[in-house]
Amino acid sequence: VTTVQRQPNTFDAVVHYRFLTGDEADYVGMARSYQQYLIERDELHRVEFSNPNMGVRLEFLGGDKERVALWDQFIPMTTIAQMSDILGSLDIPNPEVIYYGWQPYGASNMPPTSLVLEGGLGSVNDLRALADGVKASGGHFSLYYDPQKAIAVWGENGYSIRSDIALAITNATVETFNRQYGYYFTLDALRRRYQPLVADIESQLGAGLALDSIGFMLYSDFREGHTLNRQEAIEAYQNLLAGSAEFTGWFSRAIRYLSA
């Protein structure tokens, strides 16, 4: 079994040491020191808000599936109509609304490559009206999506475990656990799924995607003929997301200044 990478990755590694003393020698001081480092590199900028009302993030679970005998059935948790009623009763200005588990059979099912909603939640027209209402109140509406993850459920449709899943240097599948167990897609499979979905949501819904993981998660792929190291993954993700930067929201750190 190969456990040592024969060809080293090509990149310049730089290590910065910062020594903290006195009141700054704690985790808060570390955060401030790193903040100052990003400011000095022109990577971090102060955002001025013209609206005094800070938006509140609200995440709704559409639903999920459960096994019944030999098939799955969808269990709705929050339909589009219910979500609209909740938002109306809260009457919060500038809400940041994220809808999780919107796809057919819900959160534990692979998202499609086009905008297809679970019928038990409502229609695309219903969702468009809701998104327009959120936007009119000064907020943003997004569908939750983790583009890197292939949900690992036996018999799951939508991808090939033989060709679409990234491999470690030991030829084992690269695994993850984020809300549910899964694998990581190869870059080709990620592109093939992400790009048409973005285009379809933009044309049909005019809303956004709340992207999980890809803003901070890097992994190498040693699949023969498709090798990709983490340094190369940064550039690939930057190029992939560049065309939809205003349309997508990253849950965590911006990958723009990360390095492997």
Q: What residue ranges belong to the model's regions?
A:
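Conserved structural scaffold segments of CAZyme catalytic domains across common CAZy folds
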Residues: 1-139
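Aromatic- and carboxylate-enriched substrate-binding clefts and catalytic-loop regions
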Residues: 94-260
